[in-house]
UniProtKB/Swiss-Prot annotation:
Protein name: (E)-beta-ocimene synthase, chloroplastic
Protein localization: Plastid, Chloroplast
Catalysed reactions, as listed in the record: (2E)-geranyl diphosphate = (E)-beta-ocimene + diphosphate
Gene3D superfamilies with a match to the protein in the record: Farnesyl Diphosphate Synthase, Terpene synthase, N-terminal domain
Organism of origin: Matricaria chamomilla var. recutita
EC class (word): lyase
């Protein structure tokens, strides 16, 4: 029954893709109109008019990127990988301490090499997690030799790595953490370890909050230190804590920083540099593939009011899932992100309220016949969405025998319902309560759409009860989406926070509580910290049911949100920092001339 149903959907998808191309040709000279409900006037939007700045990354530029870095490097990479893997065997043979192992794992993850050593790391972390925590994870013969500062560093590092890996850290462990704080001396390694560990706290752990305040205060005093290396590390940590950083950006920065260390492991560093370039080359190939798709849709040429943000959307998908083996997930998530951006622009800046209602209901019903009642620009948007999702569904059905289209269509319908609520608020000049706003806004930010598609794209063994399985991870996805929303709203410029414009978290809080913008922003920052705690708890709860790549994808959504909205809206108005970040992780490779 499911196969018969999908064959019909697949046929419709093929037919209506042809319809989309025909419509694009017919509408080559189309001028779009935006209705102003208040005055009943029609404003013409011509192709020469652009609401948003043009893309910095053209299709021709992307198509010309070099992608052949791996040639003649496989043998060297394999040799280095084997040598690094031996370090884990050294630990299991008793040749290195727990502290040395934890520092190795920390370096591997920060250098972007975690995807190569997942099995090795899980095996030894399982062992460490079962060690009597009263020993602080140190071998008995080492305890007398380790200085207090090193013990505190080891304690913090162990806590952070175990918790970020999904292990439950006992209350007894935290009690020892509290007792050890009395021996804090303020050394940089110790302070940084305490600081980074404190950002893995859960609700009801005030001792870690106090440790965060202490370490932050001490680190702030070192920001003007004459030692440039020390100052760089301190400023980097205070900018965004490690657990909240986008993984590829951290890898790029840490490879440079690690290379300046006198104690750097040369083989580990060489592997990190080669691996970064190899992964980057894979990303370039993915980007070229999705760029051809985006060019083929013709949406940018025909809908002159939308943002052309393919590169930024690809950057976003790399932030969510960078590992080379998940190339299909990365490419398809980029398509989803560009469609979300396109449809968001339709709801935000172009469509009339009545037209948006028609579009929303059509998507909720997944009804291709509804296009007959739409204006041309909505037909283009609907058909692009319909064909793309049906094609994804076809690939999953072909490979695994499961029809996921109803699941994907459902989350799209829910997203557009949330879009419509916001459009109605704006149309009616209505300012919702802060609670009502957030209840809708964590859905309208599109995190659930991205994560649901990612779930099916990454999951190689989709079952008939996939939708029920998704519900088990609702909290993880919800808090990741909430962080996405809060970071987005925090990026709003002062002149955008206006009661007469679309509500956001800051304007709603200001209006409801009669407070200043500064007070509202501080409240949102507090909610961000609480949401991270909620998400970490949800991550731990999911560890027993969900594979690590899926959990990581949800956490990475929050991380890339933190990055893209750090200096403003990096999607709406890409500026110099966004361009530099794209260059650093997608375009510009490391120099490997000194690696034999």
């Amino acid at each position: 029954m499911a196969i018969t149903h999908y064959q019909m959907a697949s046929f419709q998808s093929s037919f209506h893709f042809c319809m989309l191309r025909k419509t694009l040709r017919q509408k080559s000279s189309l001028h779009f109109a935006k209705r102003c409900e208040a005055t009943n006037k029609i404003f013409q939007t011509h192709g020469s008019v652009a609401i948003y700045q043009k893309t910095l990354w053209t299709h021709d530029l992307i198509d010309g990127l070099e992608t052949d870095f791996l040639i003649n490097r496989k043998e060297k990479v394999n040799e280095l990988e084997v040598n690094v893997a031996r370090m884990f065997m050294d630990y299991e043979n008793g040749d290195i301490s727990n502290l040395e192992l934890l520092e190795l794992i920390d370096n591997i993850e920060r250098l972007g090499l975690g995807h190569r050593f997942q099995t090795n790391m899980k095996r030894v972390l399982d062992k460490i997690a079962t060690v009597n925590e009263n020993s602080l994870g140190l071998k008995e013969e080492e305890e007398e030799e380790e200085e207090e500062e090193d013990n505190l560093h080891a304690l913090s590092l162990k806590f952070r790595i175990l918790r970020q890996s999904g292990y439950r850290v006992s209350q007894d462990f935290q009690r020892k953490f509290k007792e050890s704080r009395g021996g804090l001396t303020g050394g940089l390694k110790e302070l940084l370890s305490i600081y980074e560990a404190s950002y893995l706290s859960l609700e009801g752990e005030p001792d870690l909050h106090e440790a965060k305040l202490f370490a932050t205060e001490k680190l702030l005093k070192l920001t003007g230190h004459e030692n440039e290396a020390m100052k760089d590390h301190v400023n980097h940590a205070l900018d965004i804590p490690l657990y909240r950083r986008m993984l590829r950006l951290e890898a790029r920065w840490y490879i440079d920083a690690y290379g300046k260390r006198k104690d750097a492991n040369k083989q580990l560093l060489e592997l990190a540099i080669l691996d970064f370039n190899i992964v980057q080359s894979a990303h370039k190939r993915d980007l070229q593939e999705v760029s051809k798709w985006w060019e083929k849709t013709g949406l940018v040429r025909k809908l002159d009011f939308i943002r052309d943000r393919l590169m930024e959307c690809f950057f976003w998908s790399v932030g969510m899932v960078f590992e080379p083996q998940y190339y299909t997930c990365r490419v398809e998530l980029t398509k989803i992100a560009t469609l979300i951006t396109t449809i968001d622009d339709i709801y935000d800046v172009y469509g009339s309220l009545n037209e948006l209602k028609v579009f929303t209901h059509a998507v909720k019903r997944w009804d291709i016949n509804a296009v007959e009642n739409m204006p041309e620009y909505l037909q283009l948007g609907f058909l692009a969405l319909y064909n793309t999702i049906n094609e994804m569904g076809y690939e999953t059905l072909s490979a695994q025998g499961i029809n996921i289209i109803p699941n994907l269509a459902r989350v799209w319908g829910e997203l557009l319902e949330a879009f419509l609520v916001e459009a109605e608020w704006t149309h009616n000049n209505y300012m919702p309560t802060f609670k009502d706003y957030l209840d809708n806004a964590w859905r309208s930010v599109s995190g659930m759409v991205l994560l649901t598609h990612g779930y099916f794209l990454m999951n190689q063994d989709v079952k008939d009860d996939a939708i029920e399985s998704l519900e088990n991870f609702h909290d993880l996805f919800k808090w990741s989406s909430m962080l996405f929303r809060l970071y987005n709203d925090l990026a709003a410029l002062a002149d955008e926070i206006d009661k007469d414009k679309s509500p956001n978290a800051i304007s709603c809080y200001m209006y409801e509580h009669s407070v200043s913008e500064e007070v509202a922003r501080e409240h949102v920052k507090t909610l961000i910290d609480k949401a991270w705690m909620k998400m970490i708890e949800a991550r731990i709860a999911c560890s027993e049911h969900m594979t690590d790549p899926l959990i990581d994808m949800a956490i990475n959504l929050a991380r890339v949100s933190s990055c893209m909205y750090q200096y403003g809206d990096g999607i709406k108005d890409p500026e110099a920092r966004t361009k530099d970040r794209v260059m650093s992780i997608i375009i510009k490779p490391f120099d490997t001339s000194e690696i034999p």
